[in-house]
């Protein structure tokens, strides 16, 4: 037990606590080949004005070192120079983790992108989060694309050889947005994917923002959530067992506490904020440790907030924009989350990992209480 505690403490110490920029969420294009009812970004889709590669290059050159780069959209694989964009941030900014959400409709392009990225640098990890928002026809209906379900499953299978080649450097995940259309079949979808696909993780996030379908798609009965969260928390533990199977018992235990405890903390924070604002158990660090860059160069502290500055106004010099008064004013408006609230897992996670209280108390506590909802 002493050995397990020592390993857990070392794991906590390896997680950075300094409140400086470490995660960038970059909407590389507004183009999308789906029509998702749950999309919070629908008003910005398929518009002109994507930044050019030259403009992105200047942004990267003037940005500090960051560890995590999310490449979103739109559908990020529609951007033809996506491989070059990844290379830019790896070479200029020392990115260690690239996280890409995708609808899985472009199988060949997705596979080539993953392979090209992982061949760049032996120290780079890539997390591909494939969207599945229901079982079978439900997924097609929510996504607005007939045949999407089958094409996405084919895309997942096509990535198995890369998973075998790159091992833990390539995390192949599924992400499900829970909404009024699919909450009743979360269990069926979760079991099907666990039993039939070689995934590293399957994550469930309640619908957020001003969606294309309006408020109707957000009408999940609150009474179904405890059972759902209990089920997906147990699923998270099973995936953790799969991911860490090769480790010795002590290491496997430590990683399980950290992983399952963190994901359960995400879910508990989302659950407590489902119907209305509830204070997070740690300060929100949006705009300090995270930045959101839109396809046209607008910059936001959080995906759910308005822009506080625009890169074209700073000649695409990210450093100048980041140090300007506009960001400081936005941080005062956010007030570490006291002045706004959300269920956005990206910001829950990044805020959590910069909080000693979260790491030393919330994560272990939520691991121990993972079955109680």
PLM features: what roles do these ranges have?
Residues 1-21, 242-273, 351-373:
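Alpha-helical membrane-targeting segments
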Residues 56, 152, 318-321:
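Hydrophobic/aromatic residues in well-formed alpha-helices
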Residues 75, 102-104, 132-134, 176-178, ...:
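Short, flexible loop/turn elements at secondary-structure junctions
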Residues 2-125, 210, 220-224, 355, ...:
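Conserved alpha-helical substructure of the radical SAM core
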């Amino acid at each position: 037990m002493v050995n397990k505690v020592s390993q857990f403490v070392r794991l906590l110490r390896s997680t950075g606590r300094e409140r400086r920029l470490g995660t960038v969420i970059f909407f590389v294009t507004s183009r999308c080949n789906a029509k998702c009812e749950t999309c919070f970004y629908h008003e910005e889709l398929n518009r002109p004005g994507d930044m050019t590669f030259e403009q992105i290059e200047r942004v990267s050159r003037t940005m500090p070192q960051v560890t995590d780069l999310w490449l979103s959209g739109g559908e990020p694989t529609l951007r033809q120079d996506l491989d070059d964009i990844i290379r830019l941030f790896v070479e200029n900014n020392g990115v260690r983790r690239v996280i890409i959400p995708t609808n899985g409709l472009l199988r060949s392009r997705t596979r080539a992108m993953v392979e090209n990225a992982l061949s760049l640098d032996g120290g780079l990890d890539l997390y591909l989060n494939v969207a599945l928002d229901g079982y079978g026809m439900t997924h097609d209906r929510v996504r607005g694309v007939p045949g999407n379900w089958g094409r996405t499953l084919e895309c997942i299978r096509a990535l198995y050889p890369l998973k075998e080649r790159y091992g833990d450097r390539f995390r192949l995940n599924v992400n499900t947005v829970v909404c009024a259309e699919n909450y009743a079949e979360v269990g069926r979808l979760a079991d099907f994917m666990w039993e039939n696909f070689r995934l590293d993780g399957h994550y469930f996030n309640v619908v957020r923002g001003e969606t294309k379908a309006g408020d109707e798609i957000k009408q999940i009965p609150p009474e179904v959530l405890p059972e759902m969260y209990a089920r997906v928390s147990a699923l998270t533990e099973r995936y953790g067992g799969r991911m860490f199977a090769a480790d010795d018992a002590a290491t496997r235990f430590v990683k399980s506490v950290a992983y399952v405890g963190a994901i359960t903390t995400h879910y508990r924070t989302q659950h407590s904020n489902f119907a209305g604002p509830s204070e997070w158990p740690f300060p929100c660090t949006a705009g300090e440790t995270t930045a959101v860059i839109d396809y046209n160069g607008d910059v936001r502290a959080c995906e759910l907030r308005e822009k506080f500055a625009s890169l074209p106004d700073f000649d695409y010099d990210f450093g100048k924009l980041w140090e300007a008064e506009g960001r400081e004013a936005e941080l005062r408006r956010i007030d570490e989350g006291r002045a706004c609230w959300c269920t956005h897992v990206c910001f829950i996670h990044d805020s959590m990992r910069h909080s000693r209280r979260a790491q030393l108390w919330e994560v272990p506590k939520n691991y121990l209480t993972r079955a109680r909802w």
